[in-house]
From Swiss-Prot:
Assembly, per entry: Interacts with UvrB in an incision complex.
UniProt protein name: UvrABC system protein C
Record's subcellular location: Cytoplasm
Chain's role: The UvrABC repair system catalyzes the recognition and processing of DNA lesions. UvrC both incises the 5' and 3' sides of the lesion. The N-terminal half is responsible for the 3' incision and the C-terminal half is responsible for the 5' incision.
Acyltransferase keyword on record: no
Species of the source: Pseudarthrobacter chlorophenolicus (strain ATCC 700700 / DSM 12829 / CIP 107037 / JCM 12360 / KCTC 9906 / NCIMB 13794 / A6) (Arthrobacter chlorophenolicus)
Main location: cytoplasm
Entry keywords, A to Z: Cytoplasm, DNA damage, DNA excision, DNA repair, Excision nuclease, SOS response
GO biological process, one term: SOS response
Taxonomic lineage of the native organism: Bacteria, Bacillati, Actinomycetota, Actinomycetes, Micrococcales
NCBIfam families: PRK00558.1-5, uvrC
Any one Gene Ontology cellular component term annotated for this protein: cytoplasm
């Protein structure tokens, strides 16, 4: 770990202006972004007494090797720049309000010809309207109930196309929970109107629809159509059941998000209730670790910045009111920023009395319970992870902590479709965004050791390339007196804002591991170590985990390291190895599936997939292609005289890749058509 004194800038070099600062690790990766009203005061607080810092801040300062800053003209600009950098660099030590992903959304795909109602998680899409978030059980119950009244399509594209081609709707079409636009029971216009009514009901206009249905029921009774009246009565009951599931907590015209938090010295739990039309429409929760000695107003500011920067900026779901437990830091600038995102005024308020204050108290109780539950669950998990990493470091006699581990596995079936996987673990937890897949061809696919050497060479060659090209885009280089003086002079002269939003090139492999784990024994370990040595890399340690006896092998060692069967370090290695194996197998199956069908046309030089399809569409089968003359072949789309001659030469034995085998489905052994 670096000594903070080795990169501490001189006090006189740091400007007293507002600005945003970044800490980088020895590999140039941004690990923390912060903002300050006075850069000098804030940065000095990191170095004056490192021993007095919070544990995570202490770890961040010692993991960094440099600090740099950018001077801005106002606190609003520093807020915007800090958010931009956190979103771009995803620093590992920043407070990140990660959704627990328990709550999906009810989505209506209004951008499609036939809108679809479905449950969705993850990134939001344009042309789709979202309601929620809700709990998984509640959303499916709501959807099932509403499809009685609004029978909107809910099937996937594949099911819809099959029904369209067969002329028969799916089961929902037969039980009247879908209007079956796939078979023409309803026009596209009427189906869209149905989907828009669904959205209007979910948006809070329930009373309009129940009143409308009550009039229809009365009309049905008047004409003695009691069966129709009974169906409408059941629809009204279903709508009221959904509508009453969310209790009215505020005035009906109230749209607000109510935030509350409960915190201790190290962590904070956040809960938010989404109130639309006076009713609680959804709930979300987060638990975050504190990096700095944040006050509650600081936490509220970061919370709103991240929640609405991600959701509101792209999807426009910012309500008119945001209720918070305490006024956030930089409240005026934050309100201005949120209003700019919404396109209309947003009020950030602290409720003092009445129904809103009572609801805030309920949300706070939820946050308190969430933090207790999180600590109960995490206590054992955090202890076990720390113990596993410590045991592994001691057993392998490594001088550095195992902050990042990468594991590689090779997968194939009798030397065909050779692939490899790379999985990443940081702080004992999988980091799936850094997982990578490799296809292996040529001589490297001849055996496992050659494949392992090839994969490690490719991965760390990328690392060396990314490392050399990573930090070229910074506008203001901190840590030098010249840069700081220039920034201070610019700010004093015209309060200019440095242009720091230039995108930095994305790097895939710029961050190296402390430990490489390979699936295999001594041969695979030696191949991996040789790949690193060939590239001149000597600060990454390599081990292998052999499956048979779960032995840990080191490079050029005649005997393995034996870890106790109850060792948490061994369990960690096994979990990483098994995850790499799973990831490699899934990629191998995917690749093998694409190659399941081989054809006699595959070996024709210059004949790609689209031209093969054109030939088969023109002649009907491979047999028809074989029987065609060059002139007939040239009539097919995309086939010129030279390619037509090559096809004829291929089938008559004149080509180098002539084949006589029929097309075969490699899974079933079925002869397709020749």
């Amino acid at each position: 770990m670096a000594n903070p004194a080795s990169y501490r800038p001189r006090t006189g070099e740091i400007p007293t202006n507002p600005g945003v600062y970044r800490f980088r690790d020895p590999h140039g990766r941004v690990i923390y972004v912060g903002k300050a009203k006075s850069l000098r005061s804030r940065l000095n607080s990191y170095f004056a007494n490192p021993a007095g810092l919070l544990p995570k801040t202490y770890a961040m300062v010692h993991a960094a090797s440099s600090v740099e800053w950018t001077v801005v003209g106002s606190e609003l600009e520093s807020l915007q720049l800090e958010y931009t950098w956190i979103k771009e660099f995803k620093p590992r030590f920043n407070v990140v309000f990660r959704d627990d992903k328990t709550y999906p959304y009810l989505a209506v795909t209004l951008g499609e010809k036939y809108p679809r109602v479905q449950v969705m998680r993850g990134d939001k899409r344009k042309g789709t309207r979202y309601f929620g978030p809700y709990t998984a059980g509640a959303i499916r119950e709501t959807m099932d109930t509403l499809l009685r009244v609004f029978p909107v399509r809910s099937c996937s594209a594949g099911v819809f196309k099959r029904a369209e081609s067969s002329g028969r709707p799916c089961l929902l079409g037969y039980i009247d929970k879908c209007s079956a636009p796939c078979v023409g029971r309803i026009s596209p216009e009427d189906h869209r109107a149905l989907a828009e009514d669904f959205c209007a009901f979910m948006g809070g206009e329930a009373k309009r629809f129940t009143n409308k249905l009550e009039k229809q029921m009365a009309a049905a009774v008047a004409r003695l159509d009691y069966e129709q009246a009974a169906r409408i009565r059941d629809d009204i009951t279903a709508l009221r059941k959904v509508f009453e599931r969310n209790a009215v907590v505020l005035a009906e015209d109230t749209d607000a998000d109510v935030f509350a938090l409960h915190e201790d010295e190290l962590e904070a739990a956040v809960q938010v209730f989404h109130v639309r039309g006076g009713r609680i429409r959804g709930q979300r929760g987060w638990v975050v670790e504190k990096v700095e000695d944040f006050t509650t107003p600081d936490l509220v500011e970061h919370l709103l910045q991240q929640v609405y920067g991600e959701d509101g900026e792209t999807h426009g779901r910012l309500p008119r009111e945001v209720l918070v437990p305490v006024a956030p830091s930089n409240a005026e600038e934050l309100t201005e920023w949120l209003s700019g995102i919404r396109g209309a005024r947003v009020d950030v308020r602290v409720p003092q009395r009445g129904d809103k204050a009572a609801l805030m108290s309920t949300v706070r109780e939820n946050a308190e319970h969430a933090l207790k539950l999180h600590k109960t669950r995490r206590a054992g998990d955090l202890t076990v992870r720390s113990q596993a990493l410590q045991e592994l470091q001691e057993a392998l006699d490594l001088p550095v902590p195992l902050l990042r581990i990468e594991c590689f596995d090779v997968s194939h079936v009798q030397g065909t479709n050779v692939v490899a996987s790379m999985v990443v673990v940081e702080d004992g937890l999988p980091k799936k965004s850094d997982y990578r897949k490799f296809s292996i061809t040529g001589p490297a696919a001849s055996d496992d050791t050659a494949a392992m050497h090839d994969v490690l060479t490719r991965r760390f060659r990328h690392y060396l390339q990314d490392k050399s090209a990573q930090v070229d885009e910074d506008v203001l280089e901190a840590g030098t007196a010249e840069a700081a003086a220039e920034a201070a002079a610019d700010a004093a002269a015209e309060a200019a804002v440095a242009d720091t939003t230039t995108p930095i090139p994305k790097t895939k492999f710029a961050y190296p591991p402390n430990l490489v784990v390979v699936d295999g024994g001594q041969p695979q370990v030696n191949a991996a170590a040789r790949a690193l040595a060939d590239l001149g890399i000597d600060d990454v340690y390599v081990v292998g985990l052999a499956k048979r006896l779960e032995e840990v092998w080191l490079p050029d060692s005649d005997f393995p390291v034996i870890l106790p069967r109850t060792s948490q370090g061994l369990y960690l290695l096994q979990r990483i190895r098994d995850e790499a194996h799973r990831f490699a197998i899934s990629f191998h199956r995917q690749k093998r599936g694409k190659a399941m069908t081989v054809s006699a046309l595959d070996g024709v030089p210059g004949l790609g997939a689209s031209k093969r399809k054109a030939l088969l569409a023109h002649f009907g089968s491979v047999k028809g292609v074989k029987a065609a003359t060059p002139e007939e072949l040239a009539q097919a789309k995309g086939i010129g005289p030279a390619l037509a001659a090559a096809i004829v030469s291929h089938f008559t034995g004149g080509g180098p890749a002539a084949v006589t085998v029929p097309a075969i489905n490699m899974t079933t052994g079925e002869i397709i058509e020749t």
